[in-house]
Amino acid sequence: MSNRLKNEVIAITGGGAGIGLAIASAALREGAKVALIDLDQGLAERSAAMLSTGGAVAKGFGADVTKAADITAAITSAEQTIGSLTGLVNNAGIAGFGSVHDADAAAWDRIMAVNVTGTFLASKAALAGMLERHKGTIVNFGSVAGLVGIPTMAAYCAAKGAIVNLTRQMAADYSGRGVRVNAVCPGTVTSTGMGQQLLGSDTSPEVQARRLAKYPIGRFGTPEDIAEAVIFLLSDQAAFVTGAAFAVDGGMTAI
């Protein structure tokens, strides 16, 4: 398909690399203009420049999503540069390990801040214009860890579970005001830094087989798998979809 996002303007947090970059690339192919927002401004700008070929419009901006002034300024700059936002993808996130009894409190706070507070602050900044124009779509990033319990990942499960329910609450607030809100919940995506962190360092065939056994489809995900789901949720093909937690996990949560 093509032009599903024609004339749309999409901001993507964590857009400089990995899944965020794959979403940006897919959105451009579908006719959107994109703003890549990343903690590493240089990375965001380099990635945007790489994508800006053949008339594609991509711009990079730096922001710490845990700081209201930062993310508000980035979204304001994006709107001034490429146009009023019609879509926001809250992709920025971090993971970490630890059960409740041995979790580091500072690490807990940081995981909550980037994942949950970052989603809140970016959404708050984008919603001002979306509600005024009565038009917008927000895609939050949950995870299979927000749908089921994952051993030794207390903070990450709590954060992603919070995002899934925040998505439902936002849909209840804003769907009648022209703004759809959904969450995409990926399974393991091995080619990203977070995916490698979640899988650990043991890549022996026996361990790999045990990991793959959790995925009925027989493989791990790719950034492009997740990007295609996000594009669907951003597009008018999902015009009747709001408040959904969309599992893109190769069947992991089905068994």
From Swiss-Prot:
Q: Which GO terms describe its biological process?
A: fatty acid biosynthetic process
Q: Which InterPro entries match?
A: NAD(P)-bd_dom_sf, Sc_DH/Rdtase_CS, SDR_fam
Q: Alphabetically list the UniProt keywords.
A: NAD, Nucleotide-binding, Oxidoreductase, Plasmid
Q: Pfam families recorded for this chain?
A: adh_short_C2
Catalytic residues (positions): 156
Question: What results from changing residue 156 to F?
Answer: Loss of activity
Q: What is its EC number?
A: 1.1.1.269
Spell out the residues of the site Transition state stabilizer.
Answer: 143
Q: Which residues of this protein are annotated with the site description Lowers pKa of active site Tyr?
A: 160
Query: Out of the domains of life, which is the source?
Result: Bacteria
Q: Which residues bind NAD(+)?
A: 19, 38, 64-65, 91, 160, 189-193
EC class of this enzyme? oxidoreductase
**Disulfide partners:** none
- PANTHER family named in the record: NAD(P)-BINDING PROTEIN, SHORT-CHAIN DEHYDROGENASES/REDUCTASES FAMILY MEMBER
Indicate the family of this protein. Belongs to the short-chain dehydrogenases/reductases (SDR) family.
Q: What is this protein called?
A: 2-(S)-hydroxypropyl-CoM dehydrogenase 3
